[in-house]
Amino acid sequence: MTSKLEQLKQFTTVVADTGDFEAIARVKPVDATTNPSLLLKAAAIPAYAELLNASVRDCKGDVGLASDRFGVAVGQEILKVIPGRISTEVDARLSFDQDAVLKRAHRLIELYDKAGVGRDRVLIKIASTWEGIRAAEILEKEGIQTNLTLLFSFAQAAACADAGVFLISPFVGRIYDWYKKANGNDYTGADDPGVQSVTRIYNYYKANDYKTVVMGASFRNLSQIEQLAGCDRLTISPDLIEKLAADTGKLERKLAPGHAGEARLSLNEAQFRWLSNEDAMATEKLAEGIRQFARDQEKLEALLQAKL
């Protein structure tokens, strides 16, 4: 009997959401994504000890550079066990500074280049702020492809598509968390607000022939994944990938091109900020996500600083 994982792979590219290359080798995804929180967890894995030590060599006390070198080193290890691409994230503390995002993205690409890894195997992850989206628009024109993350609203998705970014990562589980806490409801199936958000974005992109890839992210359970079967890509934690592999039930495709979607929405900065302000969930979860990534970035830098 075919597993749900194999059925899912027939119409969705499966991506591993982890920095643990041993787990990635075990679940065999096409691509992989990392973020500051996952890199912090990876730093505690004994197999990464030498990568941490190597990252601080010749950094001249620049802990930010050491952090970027560690992220790239982890990316290199992951690329040895996947056929596709690695997403490496720009420091979340730069999320509201377009020029700083550009500089850090260029440095990450330069580090990968020095390591012999081509641009065609890397996506630069950037928070979906107005400044981040504008930076991504410039990077795309330079031939550096991007993954816009911490995406919680339709306004963010519309702005990303308009900017021509390569890929977006709309979050499912964190949206579910917010509504469950706010309303006390334990949403299931197609009633899940996170599932509804990604479904709306997917249909909008396909109806308007946007080429931007939709990669659902942040899953709390198998039901959320199953409800988005057919999405371009889904980035899933290794434990949920293994649960899909162990389940031999039938998996029905839920998303496919051809469904009705809303007309194109082109937003200027003022309109983007107003729509974002009107969406309490998206405003709160974006701010919370940036703060959490920033705190974990600081913890990672503290580990590296101790080795400088």
Curated annotation (Swiss-Prot):
> What GO molecular function annotations does the UniProt record carry, in alphabetical order?
transaldolase activity
Q: Where is the active site?
A: K125 (schiff-base intermediate with substrate)
State the pathway, as annotated in the record: Carbohydrate degradation; pentose phosphate pathway; D-glyceraldehyde 3-phosphate and beta-D-fructose 6-phosphate from D-ribose 5-phosphate and D-xylulose 5-phosphate (non-oxidative stage): step 2/3
**Complexes and interactors:** Homodimer.
What is the similarity comment for this entry? Belongs to the transaldolase family. Type 1 subfamily.
State the function annotated in the UniProt record: Transaldolase is important for the balance of metabolites in the pentose-phosphate pathway.
Q: What protein name does the entry list? A: Transaldolase
- Organism the protein comes from: Pseudomonas fluorescens (strain Pf0-1)
